[in-house]
């Protein structure tokens, strides 16, 4: 919620190198604190490395990982360069950019609330709406920059949807992973998501270098469309099979 805008403010005041230096110091302090305060807990699972191929044969989990890397790639293709986009393409002042980034982050709390309220009622519809929403918003990013009001509204919706989508897939990972492999599945999910972050930043950088920063939304939107197509054509089908098998077993 506050990390990106706070980092931006620090960068504007004393330089971007100090932003990363402060992040390193804070991260080190947190690491030492956790190392000294958290107790060692014995493993409660019986998962071993030999079981990894069986975990990856879980079609729903594999689909979650595929969608997660596609989602993170599409999201960070645009979000990784949203600050210069708002300044150069939308023509916003430094203060307005900072305020928009704060709203972007804060809207994620609303996304978490919507998840808790509506996701349990219909998981398929919720995931489908989030997947289609992120694709639509990214494709409309450049058009929304014609007005400060529309680009701010789009950023708020974008922050809301991206948080809700991410939380939903964390739930799916826990729901469909074997009981003794939940921690491993979540670790893979985290690694896959970070791979998507790096891939998205790389694609966004290529767009900025060889095309225009104004087109980052189109690039991210095309990846998001792939996410939506995979979701509707393959992922939901595997989810329904797993849910049906679980119900039959019970």
What residue ranges belong to the model's regions?
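Structural signature of the two symmetry-related core transmembrane helices
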Residues: 24, 125-140, 221
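Helix-to-loop junctions at the C-terminal end of transmembrane segments
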Residues: 110-123, 208
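Intracellular juxtamembrane helix-capping segments at the cytosolic ends
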Residues: 164-178
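Extracytoplasmic gate region of multi-pass secondary transporters
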Residues: 60-101, 106
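A late C-terminal transmembrane helix in Major Facilitator Superfamily
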Residues: 176-213, 220
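Juxtamembrane intracellular "pre-TM" segments in multi-pass secondary transporters
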Residues: 37-65
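A membrane-interface helix-boundary motif in multi-pass transporters
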Residues: 12-24, 206-225
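Helix-loop-helix hairpin linking two adjacent transmembrane segments in secondary transporters
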Residues: 1-36
């Amino acid at each position: 919620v506050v990390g990106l805008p706070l980092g931006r403010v620090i960068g504007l005041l004393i330089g971007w190198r100090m932003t990363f230096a402060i992040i390193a110091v804070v991260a080190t302090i947190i690491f030492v604190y956790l190392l000294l305060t958290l107790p060692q807990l014995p493993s409660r699972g019986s998962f071993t490395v030999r079981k990894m191929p069986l975990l990856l044969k879980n079609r729903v989990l594999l689909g979650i990982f595929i969608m997660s890397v596609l989602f993170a790639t599409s999201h960070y293709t645009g979000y990784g360069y949203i600050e210069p986009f708002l300044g150069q393409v939308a023509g916003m002042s430094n203060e307005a950019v900072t305020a928009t980034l704060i709203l972007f982050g804060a809207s994620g709390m609303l996304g978490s609330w919507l998840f808790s309220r509506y996701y349990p009622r219909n998981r398929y519809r919720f995931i489908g709406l989030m997947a289609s929403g992120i694709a639509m918003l990214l494709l409309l990013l450049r058009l929304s920059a014609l007005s400060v009001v529309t680009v701010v509204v789009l950023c708020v919706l974008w922050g809301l949807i991206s948080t809700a989508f991410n939380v939903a897939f964390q739930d799916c990972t826990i729901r469909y992973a074997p009981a003794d492999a939940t921690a491993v599945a979540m670790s893979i999910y985290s690694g896959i998501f970070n791979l998507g972050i790096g891939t998205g930043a790389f694609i966004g950088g290529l767009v900025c270098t060889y095309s225009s920063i104004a087109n980052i939304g189109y690039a991210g939107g095309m990846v998001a469309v792939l996410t939506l197509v995979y979701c509707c054509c393959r992922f939901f089908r595997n989810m329904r099979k797993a849910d049906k098998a679980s119900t039959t077993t019970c």
